[in-house]
From Swiss-Prot:
This is Glutamate-1-semialdehyde 2,1-aminomutase. It is found in: Cytoplasm. HAMAP family: HemL_aminotrans_3. The keyword Membrane does not apply. It comes from the Bacteria. SUPFAM superfamilies: PLP-dependent transferases (SSF53383). One of its GO terms (molecular function) is glutamate-1-semialdehyde 2,1-aminomutase activity. It is an enzyme of class 5 (isomerase). Transmembrane segments: none annotated. InterPro entries: 4pyrrol_synth_GluAld_NH2Trfase, Aminotrans_3, Aminotrans_3_PPA_site, PyrdxlP-dep_Trfase, PyrdxlP-dep_Trfase_major, PyrdxlP-dep_Trfase_small. Pathway: Porphyrin-containing compound metabolism; protoporphyrin-IX biosynthesis; 5-aminolevulinate from L-glutamyl-tRNA(Glu): step 2/2. The gene is hemL.
Amino acid sequence: MPLKIDRSIEAFSEAKKVIPGGVNSPVRAFKSVGLNPVFIERGEGSKIYDIDGNCYIDYVGSWGPLILGHRHPKVEEALANCLKKGTSFGAPTLLETEMAEIIVNAFPAMDMVRMVNSGTEATMSAIRLARGFTGRNKIVKFEGCYHGHADSLLIKAGSGALTLGVPTSPGVPANIANNTITAQFNDLALLEEIFAQEGNDIAAVILEPVAGNMGVVPPKPGFLEGVRELTRKYGALLIMDEVMTGFRVHWGGAQVLYNVEPDITTLGKIIGGGLPVGAYGGRREIMEMVAPAGPVYQAGTLSGNPLAMTAGIATLTVLKEEGVYEQLEEKSSYLESGLKEAARAAGLKLWFNRVGSMLCTFFTSEEVVDYKTACTSDTQKFAVFFKTLLENGIYIAPSQFEAMFVSLAHSKDDLDKTIEASYKAFKAAAEN
């Protein structure tokens, strides 16, 4: 049954007059699935409600931060109390230190942490710090790994084993792109070749320990360990971008889950409890290079603001409770098994990847281990799948190359309804 979204259609038309593309982040426009975006009015627990009154079980969770679900009472209460004291001061607060202590205690590789306002700020600052610490300029990233929209990270790979960066976006100067080298995720041999040729000029390797922006792609056994070994051998730093995976896949992030310690870690999403936030941290001798302790400059008007710190502390306090990650694993495993069975019953041979409470259904029968294999997915079939799910009250990311996020708020009834709707959506995709 077609979804009634008349008010959302009208709202999108109005938004496009004053906002580029009608949205403040491109994927929200539903362009890749050929639909009009739904405009959300409110959220409650595992559900979101659009301005036309439609209710959806939400697996976007504001793109990952809402691991507790919408309007968790402890987060809401903490924010209400904080608002009574003010919104921002541009001065040190006890909340900043409390948040920093929680983070460094959770991440064994981190002695100090600096708060910023977004994941992009965190990765941008981490790269500047790595260059300042090593005195080198080149950065290695992996194709399909997204680290925010800083110039040096908006780079894709060309052909050949060792390719200097080519800008993905207009507006990125070639001389900036030339300092970014692109490797292939899960391909240690290529990375070894890159270091053999460029190792003395490489300041850092930056990676998502679980790639979450080409679907969900876990590291092959030995891959992260191999990257760690190569960076140490050549005197480069290892930056783990845990903006998505930090406190999502494990308390202490993917680096604790896989037991590989980076030099610098970037965080965001969950540590703000749904408010704008970012952070980067690492070993003391590296972090003491950051101003005002050292010469590497970074600043921010709203960095460490009380509201984000309050929401983040409340969220992390709940996550620290006994059994929380076991609950998330149980829910996520149940959903994954149900989706696999629904796809089989619908006659589709698909590939599923999951790490903790983030998972992805790839519309390909090929094992997905990197950007190239992720791109074998049938995006037209995914678009049919997405549309059918939306019509049946299930809200997932409007892109084949994004994760589904399970939250503590998802009930067994939510998961069962999702599996039932997915069977219908898989059938529709199979017939497309």
